[in-house]
A protein has these predicted regions:
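ATP-dependent carboxylate-amine ligase
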Residues: 1-198
Length: 198
């Protein structure tokens, strides 16, 4: 294959949704969604991407980390330390949010925030977002942090932290209805939405 052909194909490559995919909200932030997997050993890769972008503000949202040995608190603490060096604000979401062990100074300065639910984190992001900022969302798939993007127009009505569905919210498309109406089972009219934008 010629270098010209390779360059042409690379130039038109679209990332897979939820694998560090780029999503721009008109007049709002840009999301980098990395919500398909979150093995501990790979956390620094998306953080390096966040470091490399130019933005008026950079925020990092972490849900759940997977695939690590040893003490989970130590892993979340290390993840927080790495993120605080890159992001203006670090947000932890879910049952493990307290494991960041952020220093008191970071709490006082608003460098760190913790939310028990994805719904609360979404409300906070929507209430504090500025045009031109970049928000990197990173988590294992079971927390469905893609809802942070999908809720930007208020469309999300399915808010359990873990619904049990292995399908992403893009695939399930049940996020527009309360969980009690669909139980996390993808509908028969499932459609692909949320294609990455450049």
């Amino acid at each position: 294959m010629s270098p010209t052909t390779i360059a042409a194909r690379v130039a038109t490559f679209q990332p897979v949704v939820r694998r560090l995919s780029l999503h721009q909200v008109p007049g709002g932030p840009t999301f980098l969604l990395d919500t398909a997997k979150a093995p501990y050993h790979s956390l620094k890769l998306p953080l390096e991407t966040l470091r490399s972008v130019s933005a008026v503000r950079k925020r990092f949202v972490l849900g759940q980390i997977s695939d690590y040995a040893g003490n989970s608190t130590a892993k979340y603490r290390e993840a927080y330390r790495a993120a605080r060096e890159v992001a203006d604000e670090v947000i932890f979401v879910g049952a493990t949010a307290h494991k960041a062990c952020a220093p008191d100074d970071d709490l006082a300065q608003g460098k760190f925030r913790a939310f028990e639910t994805v719904e609360a984190a979404s409300a906070y992001l929507k209430g504090t977002a500025v045009a031109g900022e970049v928000i990197l969302a990173k988590s294992a798939s079971n927390l469905h942090l893609e809802r942070l993007l999908l809720d930007w127009d208020g469309a999300v009505r399915c808010w359990p932290n873990e619904c049990g569905s292995r399908a992403s919210c893009f695939e399930c498309n049940g996020y527009r209805a309360p969980f009690s109406e669909h139980g996390g089972r993808p509908g028969r009219t499932t459609q692909r939405v949320g294609r990455p934008q450049t």
